[in-house]
Amino acid sequence: MKKIVINGNRPLKGEVTISGAKNSVVALIPAAILADSPVTLDGVPDIQDVHSLIEILEIMGAKITFENNTLIIDPTEVVSVPMPKGKINSLRASYYFMGSLLGRFGEGVVGLPGGCYLGPRPIDLHIKGFEALGAHVTNEHGAMYLRTDEAGLQGTRIFMDMVSIGATINVMLAAVKAKGKTIIENAAREPEIIDIATLLNNMGAKVRGAGTDVIRIEGVEELHGCRHSIIPDRIEAGTYLAMAAAMGEGIKVRNVIYEHLESFIAKLQEMGVKMTIEEDMIEVHPSHDLKMTTVKTYPYPGFATDLQQPLTPLLLKAQGTGEIIDTIYAQRNKHIPELVRMGADASVEGNMIILNGPNQLHGAEVVASDLRAGACLVTAGLMAEGTTTIYNVEYILRGYDHIIEKLTALGADIQMLETEEQEGPFEVDQ
């Protein structure tokens, strides 16, 4: 077990470069097994989720090379084997193997996914999509068994009962080699969907409409390898923009796509954060006398649920009373008791978070309950007077590439240490 120790209230200055998108790469890697020759992914973040997926691929027989953020996957000798439950339990995005195994083999066994606990995240939509394509899906002893009959997967029209990025991607992976045409209606529109579609099309798939709410797929018989560059991580970018606004004395955030962050940047500007926006760089200038605002999360292009927690510490620096309402994951509020421990005037009322500011945070021992809560606590630690110790940092390492090194380069006093036996709070009530 590791912990992060931050000596806070120190100004940050310099440049930080954003890594490839975690929410893309966790689907791009399973998608690679659909090809009949090697797939090269550039800009792959060096995060724990990537290493877990690599281990799963190697168990399946893939040959892997991962150096300097370039991942080469040779799926030529991949076989359909039951997914190792330990890796699946620690990785929610492993459910993308359901779609890619169905697409390649017409069958698969995948343990029920884990990852961050954010309340119920049912995979009913995924199963409904697979069944519409002609698959038979059963839950046996905590694993999903996926099968097809001799006719294989058949293209069809699928209406998503609710907007789901995971279900949209999974159905895309299964449908690209199905017979005939598949139409996904009420599809998710996230940039990561476009990234997945770009990879699939480079492999020889015929996917149209990604980025809109109707995706059309014409099935093909085979897919080949290709080279693909992953889009920048808009959630990591938003996290560093919030840190820069909170503690920066001039920070340039490089390798960003402004259009992917419009709703987030609009909130920063509403608060009074001063920025210069260029083609692939955003510079955050020292900003004072921030104004409180209300945040309500929605599917893309609305305000991303993954960014409400990283923004919370900055909101606590602003004057006034504000609210955060997460319409995607109503239980995404486990960071609030930890911020209160640091002196925040914040509370949870139903599905709403109430914030009163400004607050001067103070160092404390806190625990990360999930990936984005961990990022929130890192930002809070940077803002706080005194020393903050964050436990359960394995969550943070799942999704932030070299966060210690990046923050150290900006002038933060931050380090990651091994925890002593019996040290620190390691669990959060869920």
Curated annotation (Swiss-Prot):
<protein>
    <recommendedName>
        <fullName>UDP-N-acetylglucosamine 1-carboxyvinyltransferase 1</fullName>
        <ecNumber>2.5.1.7</ecNumber>
    </recommendedName>
</protein>
<dbReference type="InterPro" id="IPR001986">
    <property type="entry name" value="Enolpyruvate_Tfrase_dom"/>
</dbReference>
<feature type="binding site">
    <location>
        <position position="328"/>
    </location>
    <ligand>
        <name>UDP-N-acetyl-alpha-D-glucosamine</name>
    </ligand>
</feature>
<feature type="binding site">
    <location>
        <begin position="121"/>
        <end position="125"/>
    </location>
    <ligand>
        <name>UDP-N-acetyl-alpha-D-glucosamine</name>
    </ligand>
</feature>
<keyword id="KW-0131">Cell cycle</keyword>
<dbReference type="GO" id="GO:0005737">
    <property type="term" value="C:cytoplasm"/>
</dbReference>
<comment type="similarity">
    <text>Belongs to the EPSP synthase family. MurA subfamily.</text>
</comment>
<keyword id="KW-0133">Cell shape</keyword>
<dbReference type="Pfam" id="PF00275">
    <property type="entry name" value="EPSP_synthase"/>
</dbReference>
<dbReference type="InterPro" id="IPR005750">
    <property type="entry name" value="UDP_GlcNAc_COvinyl_MurA"/>
</dbReference>
<comment type="function">
    <text>Cell wall formation. Adds enolpyruvyl to UDP-N-acetylglucosamine.</text>
</comment>
<keyword id="KW-0132">Cell division</keyword>
<dbReference type="GO" id="GO:0051301">
    <property type="term" value="P:cell division"/>
</dbReference>
<keyword id="KW-0963">Cytoplasm</keyword>
<dbReference type="GO" id="GO:0019277">
    <property type="term" value="P:UDP-N-acetylgalactosamine biosynthetic process"/>
</dbReference>
<feature type="active site" description="Proton donor">
    <location>
        <position position="116"/>
    </location>
</feature>
<keyword id="KW-0573">Peptidoglycan synthesis</keyword>
<dbReference type="GO" id="GO:0009252">
    <property type="term" value="P:peptidoglycan biosynthetic process"/>
</dbReference>
<comment type="pathway">
    <text>Cell wall biogenesis; peptidoglycan biosynthesis.</text>
</comment>
<feature type="binding site">
    <location>
        <begin position="22"/>
        <end position="23"/>
    </location>
    <ligand>
        <name>phosphoenolpyruvate</name>
    </ligand>
</feature>
<feature type="modified residue" description="2-(S-cysteinyl)pyruvic acid O-phosphothioketal">
    <location>
        <position position="116"/>
    </location>
</feature>
<keyword id="KW-0961">Cell wall biogenesis/degradation</keyword>
<keyword id="KW-0808">Transferase</keyword>
<dbReference type="InterPro" id="IPR013792">
    <property type="entry name" value="RNA3'P_cycl/enolpyr_Trfase_a/b"/>
</dbReference>
<dbReference type="InterPro" id="IPR050068">
    <property type="entry name" value="MurA_subfamily"/>
</dbReference>
<dbReference type="GO" id="GO:0071555">
    <property type="term" value="P:cell wall organization"/>
</dbReference>
<dbReference type="GO" id="GO:0008760">
    <property type="term" value="F:UDP-N-acetylglucosamine 1-carboxyvinyltransferase activity"/>
</dbReference>
<feature type="binding site">
    <location>
        <position position="306"/>
    </location>
    <ligand>
        <name>UDP-N-acetyl-alpha-D-glucosamine</name>
    </ligand>
</feature>
<dbReference type="InterPro" id="IPR036968">
    <property type="entry name" value="Enolpyruvate_Tfrase_sf"/>
</dbReference>
<feature type="binding site">
    <location>
        <position position="92"/>
    </location>
    <ligand>
        <name>UDP-N-acetyl-alpha-D-glucosamine</name>
    </ligand>
</feature>
<dbReference type="GO" id="GO:0008360">
    <property type="term" value="P:regulation of cell shape"/>
</dbReference>
<keyword id="KW-0670">Pyruvate</keyword>
